[in-house]
Curated annotation (Swiss-Prot):
Homotrimer; each monomer consists of a GP1 and a GP2 subunit linked by disulfide bonds. The resulting peplomers (GP1,2) protrude from the virus surface as spikes. GP1,2 interacts with human CD209 and CLEC4M (collectively referred to as DC-SIGN(R)). Asialoglycoprotein receptor (ASGP-R) may be a liver-specific receptor for GP1,2. Members of the Tyro3 receptor tyrosine kinase family may be cell entry factors interacting with GP1,2. The chain crosses the membrane at residues 649-669. This is Envelope glycoprotein. Residues 1-18 form the signal peptide. Belongs to the filoviruses glycoprotein family.
Length: 681
């Protein structure tokens, strides 16, 4: 009997060890996946493909911008996928992250992992992260690209860049919804000491010192701040049109949208939820028992120095933010005894004429509540193009608590924030026109059970318009538009040229004459016979000619109307196929996630898992443009062409020659008659 129990116990233990969940939980070594899905590395500048955002391909020229997309997470095994060698990367990284004892927190690279071969600039970063656990991965699902190997993890001492491979496209919004489930244990990079940083480009190096990680661990209880750098490092950066800092959210639901930002900051969802939603133009500070929003403020004047704009307010569990051109921070103290009164009024603001700041009202209780819930405040630095005309959003359903430092106080005190600093209030700002509605706010995908009710946002292409707007309030004013909830939006990359209308455009049914005159055979024969009659012939031919010209114009008009209807139909078909292609890739990503514990889709299906949805939208849009261009061509005149004698002057010349010949013949006949008369007489 004991032997039987012993054998049963061994069988149970063996079966438990073979469970996929336990294998993943205990696996901390790189796991090679069958590279049946290999593709070509996409261009790093190609952020958008047919309306949905690809994660990780946004080029970040500073380690600050890139570190916001990296995090630590336990329970997920790394996997590597091969890809075809791509082009030169603009920005690469070489990271070394250790704990306080000096132990490396990154995995040792396998033998087949080599440095990314072609890098324009390599950012070398060395620092500590006392809270990191597990493996370093990309929050938005992008890959760390090495030499012809794309890995889901960051390896120690290896130069990598960020990007996607063709068969592994990940949608940022769905990725955020999937990993925003309660209990997911993200461990964010939070550096608590001054870290070594330098760059290498063209065999030259610049040694500087500064902070590079600013993301806060969501459940930390320590006061973490980043000391200022004595020497501000100069980083090669590309100045964006809009730069904003991030804040921390402690609610279970987050998801305000910023349609104008491609390189989004990350906001931390509440206790127990480790996923971070994309950064927005809103600076949000929320309490656990009260939903409140910090509204965005315009940035300092462009002439203000970067040193003055980087003043932040570290508090308990503070989150510091850097400007894209200066990774150093200036510590300051939290505004004491300051809190604004709740505001329920709908306000109107114009960015060109900002309203005067509002004085805060002393409230010790509110300050203690903020300290207990570990709230932080940050300043939003936004540089707007003077040609832009953004609309202002309004929030009338939530209490607004504002803790901000005005630009005047900041410019005077770049390192210390005065307790008397007056915050400014601004409504949320949106930089996009209205977009198509596919799902309303609060809806979730049917295959995602147990997710929090998170807002869905597809980041549209900047500086483009959305065609085929299906919003119910298409003709409403700007103020009415601001009250509509955020919706899923797809901005397509095809925009056919729309030229002006012509005389016979065929855009509407009434443009063309409904009657089309078809001459009968008898009428044609009659016209041919009457043409020889001296008086009736020319008149009949003139009537027939006028009728033919009218019929020709109607035919041209109808052809144009047919071309316009065909172009519109092709646009609708292109839109449908684009949406189907987009959501097919989204569904594929969800399936990959659900099958992760069994090795992924490729492990289950084998080579059949590869999908290649060819994108022919550009070719279709070119054909649409060609149709519209051809149908709008107009030519005047008879269009006879030919030689010079068939032109207007040629006809007159021929008539003149005939007239001269006739006169010459008459003169010759006259002379001949006289000669015969003389001889006969």
């Amino acid at each position: 009997m004991k032997t039987i129990y012993f054998l049963i116990s061994l069988i149970l233990i063996q079966s438990i060890k073979t469970l996929p969940v336990l294998e993943i939980a205990s696996n901390s070594q790189p796991q090679d996946v069958d590279s049946v899905c290999s593709g070509t590395l996409q261009k790093t500048e190609d952020v958008h493909l047919m309306g949905f955002t690809l994660s990780g391909q946004k080029v970040a020229d500073s380690p600050l911008e890139a570190s916001k997309r990296w995090a630590f997470r336990t329970g997920v095994p790394p996997k590597n996928v091969e890809y075809t060698e791509g082009e030169e990367a603009k920005t690469c990284y070489n990271i070394s992250v250790t704990d306080p004892s000096g132990k490396s927190l990154l995995l040792d690279p396998p033998s087949n992992i080599r440095d990314y071969p072609k890098c324009k600039t390599v950012h070398h970063i060395q620092g500590q992260n006392p809270h990191a656990q597990g493996i370093a991965l990309h929050l938005w699902g992008a890959f760390f690209l090495y030499d012809r190997v794309a890995s889901t993890t960051m390896y120690r001492g290896k130069v990598f860049t960020e990007g996607n491979i063709a068969a592994m496209i990940v949608n940022k919004t769905v990725h955020r919804m999937i990993f925003s489930r309660q209990g997911q244990g993200y461990r964010h990079m939070n550096l608590t000491s001054t870290n070594k940083y330098w760059t290498s480009s063209n065999e030259t190096q610049r040694n500087d010192t500064g902070c590079f990680g600013i993301l806060q661990e969501y459940n930390s209880t320590n006061n973490q701040t980043c000391p200022p750098s004595l020497k501000p490092p100069s980083l090669p950066t590309v100045t964006p049109s809009i730069h904003s800092t991030n804040t921390q959210i402690n609610t279970a639901k987050s998801g305000t949208m910023n349609p104008s930002s491609d390189d989004e900051d990350l906001m931390i969802s509440g206790s127990g939820s480790g996923e971070q939603g994309p950064h927005t133009t809103l600076n949000v500070v929320t309490e656990q028992k009260q939903s409140s929003t910090i509204l965005s403020t315009p940035s300092l004047h462009p002439s203000t120095s970067q040193h003055e704009q980087n003043s932040t307010n570290p508090s308990r569990h503070a989150v510091t933010e850097h400007n894209g051109t200066d990774p150093t921070t200036q510590p300051a103290t939290l505004l004491n005894n300051t809190n604004t009164t709740p505001t329920y009024n709908t306000l109107k603001y114009n960015l060109s004429t900002p309203s005067p700041p509002t004085r805060n009202i002393t409230n010790n209780d509110t300050q203690r509540e903020l300290a207990e819930s570990e709230q932080t405040n940050a300043q939003l630095n936004t540089t707007l193009d003077p040609t832009e005309n953004p609309t202002t959003g309004q929030d009338t359903n939530s209490t607004t608590n504002i803790i901000m430092t005005t630009s005047d106080i900041t410019s005077k005190h770049p390192t210390n924030s005065s307790p008397d600093s007056s915050p400014t209030t601004r409504p949320p700002i949106y930089f996009r026109k209205k977009r198509s509605i596919f799902w309303k706010e609060g809806d979730i995908f049917p295959f995602l059970d147990g997710l929090i009710n998170t807002e869905i946002d597809f980041d549209p292409i900047p500086n483009t318009e959305t065609i085929f707007d299906e919003s119910p309030s298409f003709n409403t004013s700007t103020n009415e538009e601001q009250h509509t909830p955020p919706n899923i939006s797809l901005t397509f990359s095809y925009f056919p040229d729309k030229n002006g209308d012509t005389a016979y455009s065929g855009e509407n049914e009434n443009d063309c004459d409904a009657e089309l005159r078809i001459w009968s055979v008898q009428e044609d024969d009659l016209a041919a016979g009457l043409s020889w009659i001296p008086f009736f012939g020319p008149g009949i031919e003139g009537l027939y000619t006028a009728g033919l010209i009218k019929n020709q114009n109607n035919l041209v008009c109808r052809l144009r109307r047919l071309a316009n209807q065909t172009a519109k139909s092709l646009e609708l078909l292109l839109r449908v196929t684009t949406e189907e292609r987009t959501f097919s890739l989204i569904n594929r990503h969800a399936i990959d996630f659900l099958l992760t514990r069994w090795g992924g889709t490729c492990k289950v299906l084998g080579p059949d898992c590869c999908i290649g949805i060819e994108d022919l939208s550009k070719n279709i849009s070119e054909q649409i443009d060609k149709i519209r261009k051809d149908e709008q061509k107009e030519e005047t005149g008879w269009g006879l062409g030919g030689k010079w004698w068939t032109s207007d002057w040629g006809v007159l010349t021929n008539l003149g020659i005939l007239l001269l010949l006739s006169i010459a013949v008459l003169i010759a006949l006259s002379c001949i008659c006289r000669i015969f008369t003389k001889y006969i007489g």
